[in-house]
A protein has these predicted regions:
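Non-catalytic, conserved peripheral segments adjacent to functional cores
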Residues: 1-94, 112-152
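Structured catalytic/translocation cores of nucleotide/phosphate-coupled proteins
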Residues: 92, 99-100
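Short beta-strand His + acidic residue motifs that chelate non-heme Fe in jelly-roll/DSBH
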Residues: 99, 107-113
Length: 152
């Protein structure tokens, strides 16, 4: 689920809201999502981080509006109407958007451009290095060309 966020412009630049929280600390855009950890990640040019999925954890990603990352999703939930379907799209690239990733949806990202790209993500489970809640899938499970720029 892609969620459009507020972005404001003036003569001095721009301002993007990353997340609003209610009085109980819950995300206004996803009140049932309880943030347990917030993480910053930088992707260098040419990097692909894919694919993995979580059994319990859900993610909300935010790519800085003036950066851009190619996002890939693959629905591995057998009870889902979109089971075995995949999609790819760009986050950032001048837009303020958040991406909600439910548990069971494999996700990955690639920086196929020339500059580093930054993202902040919120998760509803704290990372446990001794018992990580994730399953790794091959980066090319959807084909090597999945992560290449399509011309057109």
């Amino acid at each position: 689920q892609i969620i459009n966020l507020n972005m404001f412009y003036d003569d001095g630049g721009s301002l993007a809201e990353i997340m609003r929280f209610d009085d109980n600390g819950n995300m206004q855009i996803l009140p049932e999502f309880k943030v347990k950890q917030t993480t910053f990640s930088q992707m260098l040019p040419g990097t692909i981080k894919a694919f993995h999925l979580h059994y319990n954890q859900e993610d909300v990603w935010f790519v800085m509006p003036y950066d851009r990352l190619l996002i890939g999703l693959f629905d591995a939930r057998k009870d889902s109407p979109t089971y075995n379907q995949s999609m790819r799209f760009v986050l950032g690239s001048g837009r303020a958007q958040a991406l909600y990733i439910p548990r069971g949806v494999a996700h990955g990202l690639a920086n196929v451009w020339q500059n580093p790209a930054n993202m902040i993500y919120f998760v509803n489970q704290c990372f446990d290095a001794n018992e990580p809640d994730e399953r790794r899938l091959p980066w090319d499970i959807l084909g090597e060309d999945f992560w290449t720029i399509k011309k057109g």
